[in-house]
C-alpha cells in the first residue's frame, strides 16, 4: 500500500451524519395521548386546560371505559397514570386529574420529541451494593408515584361500589313491581272466580258505586252530569258481559269502570274471602 495514501486517509476527518437524520421521534404513547387530548369531540371527558399547558381528565370512569380502548390496548386508568409518570408528567391538582409536562403543549406537536422516558441509571462498578441501593429505590421518586397509584385504586373502588349500589336499588325496585303485579293478578283472578260463582256480586257493587257517584254529583253541582266514555278495558268489558251489560248505554251514555271501582271491588273480594274463612273455621 502506498504510504502517502495511508497518511492522507489518517488525516481525513470522520464523516458527519446529516442533521436530524438519526433523531428519534416521539414515542407512540405521547403521540396518541396528544391526539386524545386534542379531540374536541371528547372535551367533556378529557381536554386541554390553563391555555394549553396542561390537560385534565374530567371523567376518569368514562375515560377508562370509552377513550382508552380507542388508543391503547387496555382500559386501565392507573396504568395510564403510571405511563405519564415515566415520561415526567406531574399531577398539579389534588382535587382533579390534571397533568403537566413542559414538552406537552397544545398545538406544539414538535415538542413531543423532547420528552424522554425515565430509565433507571445503572450504578458505577466502583460503588458497592449498599451505596447503589438508595438510588435504585429512591423514596423521593417512588413515594409520590405510589400515592397517586393508591389514589387511583381508591377512586376505582369507590366507582365500583356506587355502581353496585345502583344495581341493587334497581333489582329491589323490579322485585317490588313484580310482587305488586302478581298480587294484583291474584286479586283479579279471585274476583272473577267469585263473580262466576255469585252473579249478583258485580251488579250489587256496580249499583252501590253508581248511587254514591250520583249523590256526590248532586251535592256538588245540583244536577247529574254523565261523561261519555270512549274506551273500556278488556277486563271491564268481561265483567259487564258477565252481568249481561255488554257495552249497553244508559240514556245513550256509556259508563266507565274506573280504577276506584276495581279497588273497591277487590277490597270487597278480600273481605268476603275473610268472612268465608271465618265461617269455615266456625
Swiss-Prot record:
Compositionally biased intervals (Low complexity): 1-11, 120-134
PANTHER family tied to this protein: HEAT SHOCK TRANSCRIPTION FACTOR, HEAT STRESS TRANSCRIPTION FACTOR A-7B
GO molecular function: DNA-binding transcription factor activity; sequence-specific DNA binding
Placement of sequence motif Nuclear localization signal: 208-212
Record's comment describing the protein's domains: The hydrophobic-rich region (HR-A/B) corresponds to the oligomerization domain. AHA motif is a transcriptional activator element.
Localisation per UniProt entry: Cytoplasm; Nucleus
Motif Nuclear export signal, residue range(s) on this chain: 232-240
UniProt KW Cytoplasm keyword: yes
Sequence motif: AHA, positions: 259-268
Post-translational modification: Exhibits temperature-dependent phosphorylation.
Function of the protein: Transcriptional activator that specifically binds DNA sequence 5'-AGAAnnTTCT-3' known as heat shock promoter elements (HSE).
Region (Hydrophobic repeat HR-A/B): 137-196
Subunit structure: Homotrimer.
GO CC annotations, alphabetized: cytoplasm; nucleus
GO BP: any one term: response to heat
Similarity field: Belongs to the HSF family. Class A subfamily.
Keyword Transcription: yes
Protein name, entry field: Heat stress transcription factor A-7b
DNA-binding annotation, residue ranges on this chain: 26-120
Pfam families according to UniProt: HSF_DNA-bind (PF00447)
Keywords from the named record: Activator, Cytoplasm, DNA-binding, Nucleus, Phosphoprotein, Stress response, Transcription, Transcription regulation
Span list, region Disordered: 1-24, 117-139
Amino acid at each position: 500500500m502506498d504510504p502517502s495514501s495511508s497518511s492522507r486517509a489518517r488525516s481525513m476527518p470522520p464523516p458527519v451524519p446529516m442533521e436530524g437524520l438519526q433523531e428519534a421521534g416521539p414515542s407512540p404513547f405521547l403521540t396518541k395521548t396528544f391526539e386524545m387530548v386534542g379531540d374536541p369531540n371528547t372535551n367533556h371527558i378529557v381536554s386541554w386546560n390553563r391555555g394549553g399547558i396542561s390537560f385534565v381528565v374530567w371523567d376518569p370512569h368514562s375515560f377508562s371505559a370509552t377513550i382508552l380502548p380507542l388508543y391503547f390496548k387496555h382500559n386501565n386508568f392507573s396504568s395510564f397514570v403510571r405511563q405519564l409518570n415515566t415520561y415526567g408528567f406531574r399531577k398539579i391538582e389534588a382535587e382533579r386529574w390534571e397533568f403537566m409536562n413542559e414538552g406537552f403543549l397544545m398545538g406544539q406537536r414538535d415538542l413531543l420529541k423532547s420528552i424522554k422516558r425515565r430509565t433507571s441509571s445503572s450504578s458505577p462498578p466502583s460503588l458497592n451494593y449498599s451505596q447503589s441501593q438508595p438510588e435504585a429505590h429512591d423514596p423521593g421518586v417512588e413515594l409520590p408515584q405510589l400515592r397517586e397509584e393508591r389514589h387511583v385504586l381508591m377512586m376505582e373502588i369507590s366507582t365500583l361500589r356506587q355502581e353496585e349500589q345502583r344495581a341493587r336499588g334497581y333489582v329491589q325496585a323490579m322485585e317490588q313491581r313484580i310482587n305488586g303485579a302478581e298480587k294484583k293478578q291474584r286479586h283479579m283472578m279471585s274476583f272473577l272466580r267469585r263473580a262466576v260463582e255469585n252473579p249478583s256480586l258485580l251488579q250489587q257493587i256496580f249499583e252501590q258505586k253508581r248511587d254514591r257517584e250520583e249523590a256526590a254529583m248532586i251535592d256538588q253541582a245540583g244536577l247529574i252530569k254523565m261523561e261519555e266514555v270512549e274506551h273500556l278495558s278488556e277486563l271491564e268489558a268481561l265483567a259487564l258481559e258477565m252481568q249481561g251489560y255488554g257495552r249497553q248505554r244508559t240514556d245513550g251514555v256509556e259508563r266507565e269502570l274506573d280504577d276506584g271501582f276495581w279497588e273497591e271491588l277487590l277490597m270487597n273480594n278480600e273481605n268476603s274471602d275473610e268472612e268465608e274463612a271465618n265461617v269455615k273455621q266456625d
